[in-house]
Each structure stands twice: as C-alpha cells, then as structure tokens.
C-alpha cells in the first residue's frame, strides 16, 4: 500500500510548526513583529525550504519590506535553532516569501460581495418599477 504523504510533506509540516514557535519565542527583531507562517514547501532532497509568511500589518508595504528584511537577516539563526529542534541529517536552507494569497482572497471575496450587492439592488429596482 502506498504512503498517504511524501516524507517532504511531513517534514514541511513539522518545519512550519517549529519555525512558528521559533519566530514567536526566539527572534527578537522588532522589524518582524507579528508574523504568521502560512505554508512551507520543501524540496524533494530536503535541502531547501520556502517559508511563506504573512504579517499582521498587511496594508503597510514599508513595514512588510522591513519585516522581510528582518526575516532574511535572521534566517541563519532560525536555521540553527531549527537544526537543534529537529533531527534531520540536512537542515534545509530557509527562504522566506511573503504570502499574498490571503490578501488576494480577501480582495476576490470583496469583489464577489460587491457584485452580489449590486445585483440585489438591481432586482429590487426592477421589482419597484414593475409595480408602478
């Protein structure tokens, strides 16, 4: 019987948990602030990890840039702590990527809500004009 998940998927899940804890407890850079690890993708050889993050202050581009620079600067330290927390032969090289999917999802949701609202308003206007 085939395995349900690849090893890289299981390692990615564990890395996501560990990095979230490390960012919350160990990294003291004020540029980073409130950060959420939304996803982790690990290469098949487990040598590289893309860590997708979002920030609490998503609407401020300069704060996002500063936060990303802080994460890049802290990346070697985070990698060393990750190596201590996990038992891996090779600790992946970490690359932080800002995750815009949440913002895009909210934007799409707002667009759909606006279209529905306009459509309902049009139907109400049509009903009122038919009654006259």
Curated annotation (Swiss-Prot):
UniProt record, GO biological process: maturation of SSU-rRNA
Coiled coil residues, start to end: none
Cytoplasm among keywords: yes
NCBIfam families named among the record's database cross-references: rbfA
Alphabetical keyword list: Cytoplasm, Ribosome biogenesis
Pfam families per UniProt: RBFA
SUPFAM superfamilies attached to this UniProt entry: Ribosome-binding factor A, RbfA
Function field: One of several proteins that assist in the late maturation steps of the functional core of the 30S ribosomal subunit. Associates with free 30S ribosomal subunits (but not with 30S subunits that are part of 70S ribosomes or polysomes). Required for efficient processing of 16S rRNA. May interact with the 5'-terminal helix region of 16S rRNA.
Domain of life: Bacteria
Organism (species): Pasteurella multocida (strain Pm70)
Keyword Membrane annotated: no
Cellular localisation: Cytoplasm
Protein name, as recorded: Ribosome-binding factor A
PANTHER family cross-referenced by the UniProt entry: RIBOSOME-BINDING FACTOR A, CHLOROPLASTIC-RELATED
Gene Ontology annotations for the cellular component aspect, listed alphabetically: cytosol
InterPro entries, A to Z: KH_dom-like_a/b, RbfA, RbfA_dom_sf, Ribosome-bd_factorA_CS
GO MF entries: ribosomal small subunit binding
Family listed: Belongs to the RbfA family.
Assembly and interaction partners: Monomer. Binds 30S ribosomal subunits, but not 50S ribosomal subunits or 70S ribosomes.
């Amino acid at each position: 019987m085939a395995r349900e998940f690849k090893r890289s998927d299981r390692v990615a899940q564990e890395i996501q948990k560990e990095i979230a804890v490390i960012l919350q407890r160990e990294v003291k850079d004020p540029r980073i602030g409130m950060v959420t690890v939304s996803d982790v993708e690990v290469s098949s050889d487990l040598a590289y990890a893309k860590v997708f993050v979002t920030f609490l202050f998503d609407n401020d581009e300069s704060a996002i840039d500063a936060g990303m620079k802080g994460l890049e600067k802290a990346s070697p330290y985070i990698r060393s702590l990750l190596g201590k927390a996990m038992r891996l032969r090779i600790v992946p090289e970490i690359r932080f990527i800002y995750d815009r999917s949440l913002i895009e999802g909210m934007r799409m949701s707002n667009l759909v809500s606006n279209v529905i609202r306009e459509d309902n308003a049009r139907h109400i206007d049509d009903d009122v004009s038919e009654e006259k």
